[in-house]
Amino acid sequence: MLMTAEQYIESLRKLNTRVYMFGEKIENWVDHPMIRPSINCVAMTYELAQDPQYADLMTTKSNLIGKTINRFANLHQSTDDLRKKVKMQRLLGQKTASCFQRCVGMDAFNAVFSTTYEIDQKYGTNYHKNFTEYLKYIQENDLIVDGAMTDPKGDRGLAPSAQKDPDLFLRIVEKREDGIVVRGAKAHQTGSINSHEHIIMPTIAMTEADKDYAVSFACPSDADGLFMIYGRQSCDTRKMEEGADIDLGNKQFGGQEALVVFDNVFIPNDRIFLCQEYDFAGMMVERFAGYHRQSYGGCKVGVGDVVIGAAALAADYNGAQKASHVKDKLIEMTHLNETLYCCGIACSAEGYPTAAGNYQIDLLLANVCKQNITRFPYEIVRLAEDIAGGLMVTMPSEADFKSETVVGRDGETIGDFCNKFFAAAPTCTTEERMRVLRFLENICLGASAVGYRTESMHGAGSPQAQRIMIARQGNINAKKELAKAIAGIK
């Protein structure tokens, strides 16, 4: 049964998740002002699934349990499923202007499903059955799963087994008859605290020397020995200021990252999906990366829609909307944003079935998509800053605009002067101008810049990772033969 947004939030309260921030344990993390906006983002994935207007995008019928499920728990059954995934992600980006945190889990489901099938084919293991039963449980209960791939990595020039500290990549430290014990951490984990469960994957291709690091499994967020340390974001403590509203830029929604620590966590056999089969670590990584690079052609585009709208509003409020250079910049922003969407849709339309039966995206086009994502959002926010003007970063606080402290010769307050000197076109109030500029500050430089700027660079793999895959998938030799044929070279 599909949960409501309210039921999702209440379900988090029932977990015994250990969360630490600023060196202290956070007892009521669900209502903590720095965390709650990210929970609201996830809740939106539940809210829209309940809305008939969005049912076709947000929900689908499960091929495993035969019931209606949230699309975030779906195994893609067609290229239409892949396209709807991207459209759903764009919609949620438009509704939250933030990272809504469920994409990694969805992409992990599809990568692990197909990879475990092929592991079982080679080694006669039961990983595919383990995973299928696990996903049925997730679908039946409409749960959030954090997909966790990135290890801390330590010295990037060394393999996992060659690190000075062996825990810098998550690893198996003990094998038992009933399961395994793991130790290490997963870094930069988007939405991990807001998740009911975690599904762990290796972060790189591995050799036999690294076999203890070749592990994939699932565990609950409140597993014994698991805890999370909340990651900071630019301007994050603004959320803790009394009565904070306008200065936040995006009061209701936000992203979240954390370091997830596994301090000797036991994993039972039925929740293990890869255990020392090192030759399949690379396949799992590559498939997950492909799905996640496709995802960015949806979510970042939706956020981009809001950024473009905010820039256009700022131009209106500044009285500059008719300037030809402003119009041209908005056209360029739209061109860049829609190019990203084209990439997301293209790699979906060119998808194909895996041996396990679910659909995989076109890997080359997915990597082209993410390569563009590493660049275009930066240009979009640069143009937004250009249109907005310097007040975006020099504006006094909301408290100053509301201040009744008398400072003027004729009894004027601080608020009177702020509202007087920061008024703009008659089509808007000073507060409306403040609000749109604070939003742009937040998305360009503040807490939301984590999800729209730096995540666009490094999320789903840093730029060079895509270039390696583009080189691998680009089939240059075939292109040489085409050129030879046209040029008459034998």
From Swiss-Prot:
4Fe-4S among keywords: yes
Positions bound to [4Fe-4S] cluster: 99, 103, 292, 299
Enzyme Commission code: 4.2.1.120, 5.3.3.3
Cofactor requirement: FAD; [4Fe-4S] cluster
SUPFAM superfamilies hit by this protein: Acyl-CoA dehydrogenase C-terminal domain-like, Acyl-CoA dehydrogenase NM domain-like
InterPro entries reported in the protein's UniProt record: Acyl-CoA_Oxase/DH_mid-dom_sf (IPR046373), AcylCo_DH-like_C (IPR036250), AcylCoA_DH/oxidase_NM_dom_sf (IPR009100), HpaB/PvcC/4-BUDH (IPR004925), HpaB/PvcC/4-BUDH_C (IPR024719), HpaB/PvcC/4-BUDH_N (IPR024674)
UniProt keyword terms in alphabetical order: 4Fe-4S, FAD, Flavoprotein, Iron, Iron-sulfur, Isomerase, Lyase, Metal-binding, Multifunctional enzyme, Oxidoreductase
Reaction(s) this enzyme catalyzes, per UniProt: 4-hydroxybutanoyl-CoA = (2E)-butenoyl-CoA + H2O; vinylacetyl-CoA = (2E)-butenoyl-CoA
Positions contributing to FAD binding: 149-156, 188-190, 325, 386-390
UniProt cofactor note: Binds 1 FAD per subunit. Binds 1 [4Fe-4S] cluster per subunit.
Gene Ontology molecular-function annotations: 4 iron, 4 sulfur cluster binding; 4-hydroxybutanoyl-CoA dehydratase activity; metal ion binding; oxidoreductase activity, acting on the CH-CH group of donors; vinylacetyl-CoA delta-isomerase activity
Pfam families, per the entry: HpaB, HpaB_N
Purpose: Catalyzes the reversible conversion of 4-hydroxybutyryl-CoA to crotonyl-CoA. The mechanism of the reaction seems to go through three steps: (1) the FAD-dependent oxidation of 4-hydroxybutyryl-CoA to 4-hydroxycrotonyl-CoA; (2) the hydroxyl group is substituted by a hydride derived from the now reduced FAD in an SN2' reaction leading to vinylacetyl-CoA; (3) isomerization to yield crotonyl-CoA.
Assembly information from the UniProt record: Homotetramer.
Name this protein carries in UniProt: 4-hydroxybutyryl-CoA dehydratase/vinylacetyl-CoA-Delta-isomerase
Native source species: Clostridium aminobutyricum
Taxonomic lineage: Bacteria, Bacillati, Bacillota, Clostridia, Eubacteriales
Gene name per UniProt: abfD
